[in-house]
Swiss-Prot record:
Binding-site residues, substrate: W166
Gene Ontology molecular function, alphabetical: glucan 1,4-alpha-glucosidase activity
UniProt keywords, alphabetically: Carbohydrate metabolism, Glycoprotein, Glycosidase, Hydrolase, Polysaccharide degradation, Signal
Residues bearing glycans: N115, N127, N205
Xref: PANTHER family: GLUCOAMYLASE, INTRACELLULAR SPORULATION-SPECIFIC (PTHR31616:SF9), TREHALASE (PTHR31616)
Gene that encodes the chain: GLA1
Phylogenetic placement of the source organism: Eukaryota, Fungi, Dikarya, Ascomycota, Saccharomycotina
GO terms classed as biological process: polysaccharide catabolic process
Reactions the enzyme catalyzes: Hydrolysis of terminal (1->4)-linked alpha-D-glucose residues successively from non-reducing ends of the chains with release of beta-D-glucose
Source organism per UniProt: Saccharomycopsis fibuligera (Yeast)
Gene3D superfamilies, A to Z: 1.50.10.10
Active site (record annotation): D234 (proton acceptor), E237 (proton donor)
This protein's name: Glucoamylase GLA1
N-terminal signal peptide: 1-27
C-alpha cells in the first residue's frame, strides 16, 4: 500500500543533523525538506487528492521528532508547529497543536492496521507529555492544586519552559492531550492486544497502559475538572474569557475517559468525570455558557467579546471544535456535532462573511478561502489585515463530508429546519424542488435512501470539494501548506509548512475517501 512506501521514503531521508548540545540554537537546525521529486498537479482535483494524501502525511511527520523521523532537533515526541523561526517564530511545541497533530496520526494508525512506526511516534509523544507536565513554568507547576502548570500553552523543543510573555493559561490543551492519549489506549487494546511498543526502551516513563492512564491522562483530566469554569485564552491565543471550543473539547475529554477510568478500577474518579461532563454539557447548551445565541441564531465562540460589542461571535473554531470532538464512525455523547443546526448556521454565516471580506474569493461561487473570524487582523507578521487560513479552509471541507458520512453510514435522515435552511437552500439544493410549498419556517425530513436524499448527499460532497479546490489553487508547488494565504493575491504567507495545516488537509482527504467508499 502507499503508506508503506511513504514510510520507506521518509526513513530514507532521515536527517544527519546531531542532537543539540548546550544552549538551544533553534536557527542552526532547519528541518524542512520538500517531498522528493513532487510538484502539485493543478489540472484535476481527484488526481491532486490521490497524491496529496501521502505528501501531507510526509510534511506532518517531518515536524515530529522521533528516531525514525527527519526532525531531530528536539526531544523524541516533540511536535513543532512549523519550521519557521522568524516572522513568525513557530519553532515551539504547543500542547494544543501537538494533541491535534497526534489525533491525525491516530487516524492514520487506525486506518493502517496499527502501523508500528506511527505507534512509536505516539508513545514518544506520550513520554514527552509526562515530562512536560512536570516541567515548572510561568503558569505554575505539577504540584500546584489541580496541577495548575498544565495550563501552560507552549514549550521549547528541548522540553524546557518558555518563559516569555504569552497568553496564559490555555485550558484546551490538557483536554485535547487527555483525549488523544485516551484514544491511543483504546487503539492499543482494540488493534494491538493491549501491548505497548516502547516499554523495553530506555528513558520511557511508563511500562503499561495503566501507568499512562494514572500518570499522564488522569492529571490532565484533574486539571480540566479543576479549571473548566475558569477563564483562559482561546485557541487563537488572543482573548481571555469563556470559549465554546475550549468547553467543547473539555467535555469530550471527560466523557471519553469515563470508560477508561472504569477499566482501571478507578470508579470514584469515573463518577467525577461523568458528573463534570454532564455539567459541562449543560453549560455548553444553556444560558450560563451563552454560546448558543438565539438572538443571532448561531454559536458565539466568545460570549464575553459579544457582550463588549468587540466581536460578533462568528469563528471557524465553532466548526473545528465539533469536528475534533466527533471522530467519524464514533458513538459520542458529546453535543454539537456538525449536524447541529447552530453549528451549521455558524459555518454558513462565516462563509458568507468571508466571501465578501477576502477578494481572493471572488473567483469562487461555492466554497471559499476561510479565515479564523471576521475581525481578525493578524497576518503572521504583526497586525494589519487578517487572511484566510489553510486549516480553516480544510476543516470547512470536512463539514459537508461528515454530514454525508454520518447520514449514509447510519442510514439516518437529513433534517432541514428554519435555522439551517439558508445553508441548504443556497448551497446544497433548491428546497422548492423537493416541496413546492416549502417555507423557510418549516422543518423537512429527507428520508434516507430516497432520490432526494441521494441528491442532497451528492451535492454536499461537491460542496466540500469546492473548498479543496481552493486549497489546490493556492497550495505551494511542493505540496506544503503555510498557515495563511493572502486575502488579495492568494499567495501563501505566514509560517511555512504549518503542521496543523497539513493535518487538517489530511483529515479532509481521509473523510472524503471514506464517504466515497460508501457510495
Amino acid at each position: 500500500m502507499r503508506f508503506g512506501v511513504l514510510i520507506s521514503v521518509f526513513v530514507a531521508i532521515v536527517s544527519a543533523l546531531p542532537l543539540q548540545e548546550g544552549p538551544l540554537n533553534k536557527r542552526a537546525y532547519p528541518s524542512f525538506e520538500a517531498y522528493s521529486n513532487y510538484k502539485v498537479d493543478r489540472t484535476d482535483l481527484e488526481t491532486f487528492l490521490d497524491k496529496q494524501k501521502d505528501v501531507s502525511l510526509y510534511y506532518l511527520l517531518q515536524n515530529i521528532a522521533y528516531p525514525e523521523g527527519q526532525f531531530n532537533d528536539g526531544v523524541p515526541g516533540t511536535v513543532i508547529a512549523s519550521p519557521s523561526t522568524s516572522n513568525p517564530d513557530y519553532y515551539y511545541q504547543w500542547t494544543r497543536d501537538s494533541a491535534i497533530t497526534f489525533l491525525t496520526v491516530l487516524s492514520e494508525l487506525e486506518d493502517n492496521n496499527f502501523n508500528t512506526t506511527l505507534a512509536k511516534a505516539v508513545e514518544y509523544y506520550i513520554n514527552t507529555s509526562y515530562n512536560l507536565q512536570r516541567t515548572s513554568n510561568p503558569s505554575g507547576s505539577f504540584d500546584d492544586e489541580n496541577h495548575k502548570g498544565l495550563g501552560e500553552p507552549k514549550f521549547n523543543t528541548d522540553g524546557s519552559a518558555y518563559t516569555g510573555a504569552w497568553g496564559r493559561p490555555q485550558n484546551d490543551g490538557p483536554a485535547l492531550r487527555a483525549y488523544a492519549i485516551s484514544r491511543y489506549l483504546n487503539d492499543v487494546n482494540s488493534l494491538n492486544k493491549g501491548k505497548l511498543v516502547l516499554t523495553d526502551s530506555g528513558d520511557i516513563n511508563f511500562s503499561s497502559t495503566e501507568d499512562i492512564y494514572k500518570n499522564i491522562i488522569k492529571p490532565d483530566l484533574e486539571y480540566v475538572i479543576g479549571y473548566w469554569d475558569s477563564t483562559g485564552f482561546d485557541l487563537w491565543e488572543e482573548n481571555q474569557g469563556r470559549h465554546f471550543f475550549t468547553s467543547l473539547v473539555q467535555q469530550k475529554a471527560l466523557a471519553y475517559a469515563v470508560d477508561i477510568a472504569k477499566s482501571f478500577d478507578d470508579g470514584d474518579f469515573a463518577n467525577t468525570l461523568s458528573s463534570t461532563a454532564s455539567t459541562l454539557e449543560s453549560y455548553l447548551s444553556g444560558s450560563d455558557g451563552g454560546f448558543v445565541n438565539t438572538d443571532v441564531n448561531h454559536i458565539v465562540e466568545n460570549p464575553d467579546l459579544l457582550q463588549q460589542n468587540s466581536r460578533q461571535g462568528l469563528d471557524s473554531a465553532t466548526y473545528i471544535g465539533p469536528l475534533l470532538t466527533h471522530d467519524i464512525g464514533e458513538s459520542s455523547s458529546t453535543p454539537f456535532d456538525v449536524d447541529n443546526e447552530y453549528v451549521l448556521q455558524s459555518y454558513y454565516l462565516l462563509l458568507e462573511d468571508n466571501k465578501d471580506r477576502y477578494s481572493v474569493n471572488s473567483a469562487y461561487s461555492a466554497g471559499a478561502a476561510i479565515g479564523r473570524y471576521p475581525e481578525d487582523v493578524y497576518n503572521g507578521d504583526g497586525s494589519s489585515e487578517g487572511n484566510p487560513w489553510f486549516l480553516a479552509t480544510a476543516y470547512a471541507a470536512q463539514v459537508p463530508y461528515k454530514l454525508v458520512y454520518d447520514a449514509k453510514s447510519a442510514s439516518n435522515d437529513i433534517t432541514i429546519n428554519k435555522i439551517n435552511y439558508d445553508f441548504f437552500n443556497k448551497y446544497i439544493v433548491d428546497l422548492s424542488t423537493i416541496n413546492s410549498g416549502y417555507q423557510s419556517s418549516d422543518s423537512v425530513t429527507i428520508k434516507s435512501g430516497s432520490d432526494e436524499f441521494n441528491t442532497v448527499a451528492d451535492n454536499l460532497v461537491t460542496f466540500g470539494d469546492s473548498f479543496l479546490q481552493v486549497i489546490l489553487d493556492h497550495i505551494n508547488d511542493d505540496g506544503s501548506l503555510n498557515e495563511q494565504l493572502n486575502r488579495n493575491t492568494g499567495y501563501s504567507t505566514s509560517a511555512y509548512s504549518l503542521t496543523w495545516s497539513s493535518g487538517a488537509l489530511l483529515e479532509a482527504i481521509r473523510l472524503r475517501n471514506k464517504v466515497k467508499a460508501l457510495a
